[in-house]
Amino acid sequence: PFDSKADYRTKVTLPGVELEQKPSVIEQFAYSDTWSDGTASYLAMITPRLVLMRELLADTGSIYVHLDWHVGHYVKLVMDEVFGKRNFRNEIVWHYSGWNKQLQSSFEKRHDTLFLYGKSDLQYFASYFEKWESKEEYVKKRKQKIHFESDGRDYVLSDAGNGERIKRYLDEVMLEGVVVDDVWHIDKLNNSAKESVGYSTQKTKELLRRVLQASC
């Protein structure tokens, strides 16, 4: 639901013919960010839709709203009212790589935002795990000393709480993976990507995979 200022006319090219379909009244309402009132019209459009989504959402359900810096901070306030501040779960940062330019008055904008809310305290959620690339990566990030059993099997000592330490064998750690936090490093699609459909705010399969596995 981006405030994209986009032109939503549809162009269809047939052999020897090019057709252009202007948006209907319904489409203009659905994308009222193209109206003269700008952000105010956009918020007037999205607010009743968020209310409807909340009504349709199961008590165990979650909602992820994908936005960028244009209106994210405004929509967050709307979602706090619609879903309740207590049901806010995360502001997920979708960070993607790119060629950074040296700007005169700001840093390069290199992320989008996904606001995650639950419908209620009954919300279903499962942590998402990524595989470690190597044992070396694990040791470097965890800054843990490697120990060895008499048979050569390597392990680390992890904090188990109450001052106790437990053995964690590295082969098991590698299989388990690392739990993902609220900063997701996933590159955006370029036009040559196989999964690209040419839609400017298309989500990648990897991003959708995380959403589905965490909340379904």
Model-predicted segments: where are they?
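Core catalytic lobe of class I
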Residues: 1-216
